[in-house]
Amino acid sequence: MNTSILSDRAYGLLVESTIEDIRALNIEDPVERWLVFVETIRLESQVYCSRKRNQEKQIKRRCEKGIELLEQNPRLNDSLELQVHYEYFKNKLNDWTRQQIEGHQVRIKTQPRFEHCEPDIDFYATLEKKTSKKRVISHLKGADGVTKYDTEGLSDIATDFYTELFSVKRSDEGTTLKLLQNVEKRVSQKHRASMDRIITREELRVVVAKLKRNKTPGPDGIPAEFYQYFWHLIEDFYFDFITEVEKGSLPEEKNSSITSLIYKNKGDIDLLAYYRPIALMNVDVKILTKLLSMRLVTVLPTIIHKSQTAVYGRTIADNIHVVRDIIDLVNRDDEEAALLFIDQEKAFDRVSHTFLYKVLRKFGFGDRFIHWIELVYSNATTRININGFFTKKIPLRCGVRQGCPLSALLYVMIIEILALQLRANPNIVGFTINNEKLVSSHYADDSVIKITQNRCFKEVYKELADYQRASGAKVNYDKTQGLWLGKWKNRKDDPFEELYESDSQKITWTSGNVKHLGIYVGNNDPITQTFKEIIPKMIRRLNFWKPLKLPTLAKSRVIEIFHASKLFYATNFYAIPPDLEKIVTAAFLDYINFPRKKAVMSRMEMEKLRGSGGAKLINIKLKAETPKVQWLMKLVTDENLGPHRYLFERLVSPQTGPLTACQSIFAETSYLKRCKIENSFYNEALLGISKLHTFKNYPDINDEPFFYNKIFVTSTDDEIHDKTLTPFKGNKVLSKIITYGDLLNAAGTVTQPKLMAVIRKKLESIEHIRENVESHRIFGLEDGKEYEFESVSQKQIYSELVFHQSRDHPSVGKWSIDNLGVVDWVKVWDALHNQFYTEKTKSSIWEQLHLNFYTTYNFNTWHNQLQPCPLCRKIPEDVFHIIHDCKFTKVVWKRAEKVLMKIYPRTPTIHELAFGLSDTRKEDRFAVVLRNWVTFTLRHFILLEEHKTYKRNENSEVKLTPSYEKFFANFNFKATQELKLKKRLYDFQGLKDKYKSIVTVGNALAHLADGEFVWNDLL
């Protein structure tokens, strides 16, 4: 189903009539009624989509024909009527192109989609073609070793492989009982009652609202957007259906799925063992499983050991930090140790259902919750998608489906049984950290076992064998890797050699590096190997994106989302080598400036926040430093990171002089530089956090690295005192405004029970901060006591605190003071980035300011009066002239004054023409948004004319007509389309009155006639 039809009024009426027709059938069985509804909607939607697609193709052909005829007409440049028709056809064709681009973007999962870029369908078509080509399975090798290339042969191989994979996995009862004896933590009575409660309509509404969009639907073809859009109509049908299902079972057609195969980018591409099967489930069943997962996610942290990190409140980074620090510590102290990186064959798909249900009961889950799990998995089937062709149905008699919201959470409990057994075995030593045994760490199916004695190898193999017999799992010994450390680095033997049950089982042992959770760890410079693998791929992707025409703001966002994510994931654990950092910086700037040969602005200017006139381009050094600083913050605030703190102390304390490693967190930069800490990760982290140890009269957010996003305040004091920040003296705590740097400094010096007093009323007066307060604990004080704190986001209080600063842009200079007075850039940008502005408007404003005003060569030539105005030939031309004093500009403003006054009754000023309205009453904000929209569009038109005339190098005055009429004919059409789109959005959100108040302000852009919106002509 094409989700664009959901906003069509005709389709909405079709859905309503379908529901009424089904109600008229008086089907008593809720399950049958739901099945009839889903099948009817599926067929009706297919017909509607086909009809709409044909209509759009006809419109496209008409527009192309119209454009062709008009371009051949010699009167086109002289006739305003022909120009309006020409613009109409072009805009219609652009709309069609954008729809096609959006389709490409959805299919290749390119998010976010940039509405303000020029339509470039060829770019996205090429990108989709490349993506689709990767998904095609050209050949497969069967169990008999014969390679097949035809569709029938591929389907037969897939059917045989997955029929065997999803067949019943025997669970040895005796071994299961032995493993389950180690389970000590059980679900509390409160949590058990919460898990077993009846499903309510309110809970279903929350679940439906949280469904992810732009996801491939299941076999019935109905996407999540359909449920979100029409939930108010279908809620009764679905609630009755799910209530009835609990009494019996899920219908087979509902509990079926399509399995899509995704190559893992490793291993033989012709073997299905190297493909990840993703189940595309029907959304009506996914609603149920998501509801159960939302209940389960809050319970798991109470029953799962902290060595597992695929649990709410824990992160994948916790595992990698432990592995990296253990390797560094063992190698430094030359101890005996080895790490075993376990690889399981199809870990999610081999879970025995019998074992799963026993594990749930052992952990103490109630009968109703387990019954729901059994319903979801009891009679499930799937069909494999091979290049668009589907195999016959395959029963799912084992496994937890990847693609189901429940699967990862259920698997966490399965692998916990292995972790418990490894810890319970007294002959598996591992590491002892803070009197706690650390034997293994797990993130979903990625497991690492720590071995420190030769006798442990045999015991580990035995426990893995027991786990396989009980759960149905299968360890891939030939893909499992072992890493020798310390004294064992030169070992060449395989300690498991005599234990293997077959010749095909053989662990690969190395003294080099091993890739773990996307990061190389090991003995041979894993830092360089990690970044040298990531950076070239990132640069190739950047070069591919260069042809797509995007504004600078959008390019900065593209870098952050699409290209730099893997790079900065690696910086969570390693410091980027300086030579590679230079390569990355050059690649980013090259992409930002393309196709310009000369940079628009300096890198430092680009890295500033938008609120300071920058593009928020990633500051590589700061961005790479930030996760390291945040890790140190977490070390001193998270009570679950005891082992990590111990390793940190062991690694760093010998190099920090009289201070312990944790105390060095509060040391000054000069002290840390003298320490010369060898570990590059912790050296960068400590130097980074030392930058926060500053005292100021006010917490200047711009002076602090903007990635450090927490400001702490105490939860006890209610008094406000605006005094200079002063260190603590005895029992007396002088009042302060506290940043995180102040907190760290104080925590390292004071020993009194009361830590600090803060400004509180100021923060509490900000409503949106009070609503977003989170609870935190701070640890590591000398007396060992805990203090409660609350934290708020720096972004939330930025707009309030920044008013304490005097922040005129240095480039504004004499022009703004002489002609406009001192410009308050905070208010200017606050107005420009109003919440009602679209991304297109924001980007357009930014481009105008930076490409035409105070940050480029153009401003210097204007300001220094080096060239005449190309529009009116008056000398000199400066920024003030081009915006207000130019003869051409005055005519434009005069033509627009009537519309501006109609929107908001205030005479246009120089300040407004340059920067828009800002200091207005709250109740006038809708009018201000509309008036600024028109003002910015006018200014954009003026600047476009100036650029075009300058390039043509004309020596005569430029006349307003017909360029003005043509431009605003185009603007009026686009404005109408954009407002109509926003109307559909507000209608969907139930905000019709809000929309009405926006578009009908002063009846300037639109007015109501007989209850319908009528769009005005702005000419």
Task: Identify the role of each PLM range.
Residues 116, 305-306, 312-313, 444-445, ...:
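Non-catalytic, peripheral interaction segments enriched in hydrophobic/basic residues
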Residues 584, 598-854, 858, 913, ...:
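Extended C-terminal regions of large enzymes
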Residues 53-163, 197-242, 246-252, 259, ...:
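Short, charged alpha-helical motifs in flexible N/C-terminal segments and linkers
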Residues 41, 218, 256-259, 276, ...:
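Catalytic palm active-site di-aspartate
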Residues 1-58, 66, 154-156, 168, ...:
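Surface polyanion/phosphate-binding segment centered on an Asp-His-Pro turn
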Residues 190-417:
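Conserved pre-catalytic core of RNA-dependent polymerases
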Residues 192-194, 375, 388-390, 460, ...:
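Short, conserved micro-motifs composed of acidic
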Residues 859-916:
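Short Cys/His-based metal-binding microdomains
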